[in-house]
């Protein structure tokens, strides 16, 4: 009987404490980003802020010319620049170990979780405007390394109307 009363008391205490300090949930905010130059295009990039859950999807990469046909390895990196500090958001690498080549065009991957962007002091896309970059580093069959950089342009998809 005493165990039952203790269990009921603990349950009531836990239920009461979970309601205390409840804050209003942040509204869903969705942004798209893209960037391009003569050689590369990044498109369909998405950033989602949904309370503490954040999603960063790099979108797709399209190589515009034949200079990317002899690539044996490459890495892609999304990052922000704050002062002289480079803060990596998402980075992926691909290498062919058979002596062949790899295609740089395609899906750039994604990352999600609690504080995916806030861990690098990003609370809003205002912190990303003008500071979000994409970098492609390639190595060809002759061992020549090239680095390509694009600045991303952000567009808000959802409008925050306070509801």
Feature-to-residue mapping (PLM):
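Short, solvent-exposed, Trp/other aromatic-anchored flexible loops in extracytoplasmic proteins
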Residues: 91-142
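Short coil/turn motifs at secondary-structure junctions
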Residues: 81-83, 139-141, 157
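Beta-strand secondary-structure signal
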Residues: 58-60, 75, 131-135, 149-151
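Short beta-strand elements
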Residues: 144-163
